[in-house]
Amino acid sequence: MKRSMYAGHVRSEHIGQELTLKGWVGRRRDLGGLIFIDLRDREGIMQLVINPEDVAKDVMEIAESLRSEYVIEVTGIVEERQQANNQIATGAVELKVEQITVLNTSKTTPFEIKDGVEVSDETRLRYRYLDLRRPEMLENFKLRAKVTHSIRNYLDDLNFIDVETPMLTKSTPEGARDYLVPSRISEGHFYALPQSPQITKQLLMNAGFDRYYQIVKCFRDEDLRGDRQPEFTQVDLETSFLSEQEIQDIVEGMIAKVMKETKGIDVSLPFPRMSYDLAMNQYGSDKPDTRFDMLLQDVSELVKGIDFKVFSQAPVVKAIVVKGNADRYSRKDIDKMTEFAKQFGAKGLAWIKVDDGKLTGPVSKFLTEIESLLTDALQLVDNDLVLFVADELDIANATLGALRNRIAKELQLIDESAFNFLWVIDWPMFEWSEEEGRYMSAHHPFTLPTEASAHELEGDLANVRAIAYDIVLNGYELGGGSLRINQRDLQERMFKALGFTEEEAKEQFGFLLEAMDYGFPPHGGLAIGLDRFVMLLAGKDNIREVIAFPKNNKASDPMTQAPSLVSEKQLEELSLQIESHD
């Protein structure tokens, strides 16, 4: 029979109606001869009642045979429940069953299909189709669908064109490792799965499309963590003839629409703007979490003359003040924080506490002469804890920034209901890579340098600034963008600054350079990580919760066993041989 409606949509106005519902058996309870069943479908739970006095014997036998996760079809009359259940939307009604059909049976599931069930991540991924039946998981994907629907409507209304770009592209050397796809037809040649549609969307601007967007899969072969996956989805935008401010205005409007339509929140526009240098110096991060204070403070000048060489001879000494919580941290706790600090390159962690108006702790004896100055500078009061890092500026910032975030979580200083958006602007064009021993693009090699600093492409690369902007939400990089280079000579200078020979640049990017000979317009854009955005909106801490079939931390799928070995015949067709490294 045809389903009348979703089980989760039945309400008091349907009392007296005969309905046919379909779904899964949740709980089954036998009470005084009556059988009660929770019927679950996408929209919720509906209580079924089977009374042996009202149904045929065969219907009762079927009801008694039902087990969790059986798929059933039921027909009956909607009645008012004697005792309403205010915890569910259908709690005022129940279905008095007349007919039951078993559409499919089920083995006992490896875990109970309910929210809050304790089960390992690996088991959840192994039986992902069961994990996704849980209501909280379904809600995550309803939210994701609302977000993408809102984004598409917004961009469509602004005359953006949705264009699909290739999945099989050319491998380029900048950025993370590519996922490579061997070509059967061109022996020894490989496609790459795109890390982003960066170059193709720029070429669409050269084609005169003016405004492009795409909600697109991207691929990066990199080490995984809670907010990364080997394949992920981004909201990709590119525009012609707009300034960075105009692009940011478009993105802010899009996010405001999403927040209103999915969370009912009116965000304040425009978003705050913070320079990269300020973010690093005050928050120790290029993606600062502004939901709490505890800013980094530079005390280098104050401690320069003291008789403590760790401070007086360090390139920089910076501190954070943990207000009113010194008594929460024992020496053992601080030792653990010291080990944590060493993960970021710090040699150690110095500390003091304020007790009864006096500085105490291992280094307090060296601070006697400047105690009053330090107390005023850091605005110290009783029960404050001060943590110092004396090191190179980058190490001090990174270490204290990480400690700041860790301590805020430990002390629950963060307003988890807040959504703090901001732009990080005025980026350096290049970052020094210790691993590579050279400067690398902070974003990518197509970013437009500021006019005032472009001459440093042939000078000190540390001084080149980019017309780039990242959008940050609650300490996460939500997305990044920039104005792009549209002139061939400047793009060639950029490649040269990155260490490309003329031949290498032509081999890797010759098609882009050639396109710049044909009236390439000024352009710029941005990409937002959709998975990360939805994760934050859903209040989750891992993007696996908002991706239907994600990979684990080994970039494998426990359900399908991907990646897997392939046959010798397949390898032969691709002219590939696998070397053993036993």
Curated annotation (Swiss-Prot):
Protein name per its UniProtKB record: Aspartate--tRNA ligase
Superkingdom to which the source organism belongs: Bacteria
Gene Ontology molecular function: any one: nucleic acid binding
Binding site for ATP: R220, D221, E222, Q229, E477, G529, L530, D531, R532
CDD domains in UniProt: AspRS_core (cd00777), EcAspRS_like_N (cd04317)
Primary location recorded for the protein, binned into one broad class: cytoplasm
Residues holding L-aspartate: E174, R220, H443, R484
Gene Ontology biological-process entries: aspartyl-tRNA aminoacylation
This protein's encoding gene: aspS
